Amino acid sequence: MPCGDTVNIYISGSMAYDRIMDFPGKLSDHILPDKIHILNVCFTVNGMVEKFGGTAGNIAYTLSLLNERPVVIATIGKDYETYFDWLKKNNILTEGIKIIREEFTAGAYIITDKADNQITGFNPGAMKYPSGYMFHDADSKNSISLIAPGNLQDMVEYARICKEKGMDYICDPGQSLTQWEGKTLREWLDGSLLLISNDYELELIMKMTDMDKKGLLGLTRTIITTLGEKGSLISNSEFDVTIPA
């Protein structure tokens, strides 16, 4: 990718509404361990906050704060209008978002108590469907695609298209790892610009692919590993660099 040129950024992943509810007590006070086989509990909450979430939505918003204008590639449900208004307000392109009119947008329903314990229900909704973006107008030499957790069919297909077009792409498997098979994961990583994961996910990737870190660096050019309060580690075939938190 030429230095100094404007780079077109494509972010594929999920779009979701996060509906967060606050429970004033402790959830555990209302669950009887010896009666768990007939669990039937209602928690009355103090209120609900709705936030715009999903991997693609969150990453695109962060990039917009850096004055970038990424294209979001994802599916969204029939309740899309509020999310679209928010994306447009934040200068985020919606041309790559496919509306699934028979489904609701993916949604997380989260109850958090005063001890920060959580119970979450997640409806994948529109995320069950591939977005089917074809990158027809993408300038492969001045574009980059970040493939974040979302519809698995999309994740596999977008890596294939990027390779076919000669476009750099970044792999961020995250919470999608439980859906992958080792062979498919190796093929997905092969030819990528970057692999981004935390240290636990990296160990899982090495186990699933039956490869060590050196082997993975034969598939992807660079590995970025987040280490929580210890910062991040950037690795390629020549060096490791630690970035403080």
Question: Where do the protein language model's features map onto the residues?
Answer:
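Cofactor-binding loop segments of dinucleotide-utilizing enzymes, especially the Rossmann-like FAD-
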Residues: 14, 74-78, 99, 114, ...
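Conserved phosphate-binding/catalytic loop of the ribokinase/pfkB sugar-kinase fold
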Residues: 95-100, 108-149, 153
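Glycine-rich phosphate/adenosyl-contacting loop at the front of the ribokinase-like
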Residues: 2-71, 82, 244
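A glycine-rich beta-to-alpha transition motif near the start of alpha/beta enzyme domains, typified by
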Residues: 69-96
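Conserved phosphate-binding/catalytic region of the ribokinase-like
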Residues: 9, 210-245
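A short, aliphatic-rich alpha-helical micro-motif
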Residues: 138-140, 189, 217
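Hydrophobic anchor at the start of a short beta-strand
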Residues: 9, 68-71, 94, 169, ...
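Conserved beta-alpha-beta core of the PfkB/ribokinase-like small-molecule kinase fold
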Residues: 144-213, 230-232
